Amino acid sequence: NNYCKIKCRSGIHTLCKFGISTKPNCGKNVVKASGLTKAEKLEILKQHNEFRQKVARGLETRGKPGPQPPAKSMNTLVWNDELAQIAQVWAGQCDYGHDVCRNTAKYSVGQNIAENGSTAASFASVSNMVQMWADEVKNYQYGSTKNKLIEVGHYTQMVWAKTKEIGCGSIKYIENGWHRHYLVCNYGPAGNIGNEPIYERK
């Protein structure tokens, strides 16, 4: 497939390595749900855009210190099925972590991941998992060089002003009695680029 032609310094493209099928590849784990429902997709998109607007308007009071400054401009994200397919193929490997290459012919692609495990017979909702990313704003100091990506990187990708598109994948499975929900969201163009600001302040 053409994804084998997309080169990343870090390794082979996810869809070159695993193919384009979104069928789960989870070994002995019992898969309960693979892929997002239409409602979950809409929820993820709505949650991202509402949060981006909140930050852009200067209404986010949290931070280190808060509040976060308003933004000069912030793209409204739209759903992209290609980004979602790449995310779904990766989520379907049931292997928590970032894949090494997920770019498209159009742009480099950023990624947020979350996993929730519970011994209760239920799975965490996508909105709870996206909220965990947004909540990292409490550790973020705008304009500082001391922010650590490990503490704020999900937040900064969520509100990266120049990102235009998002596509996500999800798998819910049972592993040794644990109900695990693994969510992967891909973003294009990628955020968290070098020393670029997450957005220009107003």
From Swiss-Prot:
Keywords on record: Allergen, Disulfide bond, Secreted
Entry GO terms, CC: extracellular region
Domain of life of the native organism: Eukaryota
Transmembrane segments: none
Pfam families given in the database record: CAP (PF00188)
Tissue: Expressed by the venom gland.
Record-annotated SCP domain positions: 46-187
Compartments reported by the entry: Secreted
Alphabetized InterPro entries for the sequence: Allrgn_V5/Tpx1_CS (IPR018244), CAP_dom (IPR014044), CAP_sf (IPR035940), CRISP-related (IPR001283), V5_allergen-like (IPR002413)
Cysteines joined through disulfide linkages: C4-C16, C8-C101, C26-C94, C168-C185
PANTHER family, per the entry: CYSTEINE-RICH SECRETORY PROTEIN-RELATED
Protein family according to the UniProt entry: Belongs to the CRISP family. Venom allergen 5-like subfamily.
Protein name: Venom allergen 5
Organism in which the protein naturally occurs: Vespa mandarinia
